[in-house]
UniProtKB/Swiss-Prot annotation:
<comment type="subunit">
    <text>Homodimer.</text>
</comment>
<comment type="similarity">
    <text>Belongs to the GrpE family.</text>
</comment>
<keyword id="KW-0963">Cytoplasm</keyword>
<comment type="function">
    <text>Participates actively in the response to hyperosmotic and heat shock by preventing the aggregation of stress-denatured proteins, in association with DnaK and GrpE. It is the nucleotide exchange factor for DnaK and may function as a thermosensor. Unfolded proteins bind initially to DnaJ; upon interaction with the DnaJ-bound protein, DnaK hydrolyzes its bound ATP, resulting in the formation of a stable complex. GrpE releases ADP from DnaK; ATP binding to DnaK triggers the release of the substrate protein, thus completing the reaction cycle.</text>
</comment>
<dbReference type="GO" id="GO:0006457">
    <property type="term" value="P:protein folding"/>
</dbReference>
<dbReference type="GO" id="GO:0051087">
    <property type="term" value="F:protein-folding chaperone binding"/>
</dbReference>
<keyword id="KW-0143">Chaperone</keyword>
<dbReference type="GO" id="GO:0042803">
    <property type="term" value="F:protein homodimerization activity"/>
</dbReference>
<feature type="compositionally biased region" description="Low complexity">
    <location>
        <begin position="1"/>
        <end position="11"/>
    </location>
</feature>
<dbReference type="InterPro" id="IPR000740">
    <property type="entry name" value="GrpE"/>
</dbReference>
<keyword id="KW-0346">Stress response</keyword>
<feature type="region of interest" description="Disordered">
    <location>
        <begin position="1"/>
        <end position="22"/>
    </location>
</feature>
<dbReference type="Pfam" id="PF01025">
    <property type="entry name" value="GrpE"/>
</dbReference>
<protein>
    <recommendedName>
        <fullName>Protein GrpE</fullName>
    </recommendedName>
</protein>
<dbReference type="GO" id="GO:0051082">
    <property type="term" value="F:unfolded protein binding"/>
</dbReference>
<dbReference type="GO" id="GO:0000774">
    <property type="term" value="F:adenyl-nucleotide exchange factor activity"/>
</dbReference>
<dbReference type="InterPro" id="IPR009012">
    <property type="entry name" value="GrpE_head"/>
</dbReference>
Length: 172
């Protein structure tokens, strides 16, 4: 009787068991592949983040290199001008050289998108100008700039230095 029970309880070989085992094996291999792909992508992303941080840091550190290189040319011209012994005979030539160097500097700033904002005679704008004082005058409409101590400048669209100005007011 025990043999009968054993033969009844033991499962005969089932073709589905082999298919299930095969399917499990495939799924385990696929899961392992997904895990490896995930780990690879995670490592790639970490490298990307590290490189992006390094690149941004270098951009912050060396971003002004082109401007500085251009400014050094102007500095060289000023150094040459300062090495000249100025006399009455060469004063006009010296002044012309300094004027040319100043123009070169202004041109360089424009090439780097630093633009002077016209101020004299313009209406006072607190987002662009800093009023140092006011002056009673008939020469200029009230609220307009009568004198400029420091010119305002912008870099692209941003004011990087407000102008220091005197604003006209109506005489009393």
């Amino acid at each position: 009787m025990s043999e009968e029970n054993n033969s009844q309880n033991s499962n005969p070989p089932n073709p589905e068991n082999g298919e299930i085992a095969s399917e499990i094996q495939k799924l385990q291999e696929q899961a392992e592949k997904f895990k490896n792909d995930y780990l690879y992508l995670r490592a790639e992303f970490e490298n990307y983040k590290r490189n992006a941080i390094k690149e941004r840091s270098e951009l912050m550190k060396y971003g002004g290199e082109r401007l500085v290189r251009d400014l050094l040319e102007v500095v060289d011209n000023f150094d040459r001008a300062l090495s000249v012994n100025v006399s009455a005979e060469n004063f006009n030539t010296f002044k012309q050289g300094v004027d040319m160097t100043a123009q070169e500097l202004k041109s360089l700033l424009q090439r780097h998108n630093v633009i002077e904002i016209p101020a004299h005679g313009a209406p006072f704008d607190p987002s662009v100008h800093e009023a140092l004082s006011s002056e009673a005058t008939d020469q200029m409409a009230p609220g307009h700039i009568v004198r400029v101590f420091k010119k305002p400048y912008k870099l692209h669209d941003k004011v990087i230095r407000p102008g220091q100005v005197v604003v006209a007011k109506k005489p009393e």
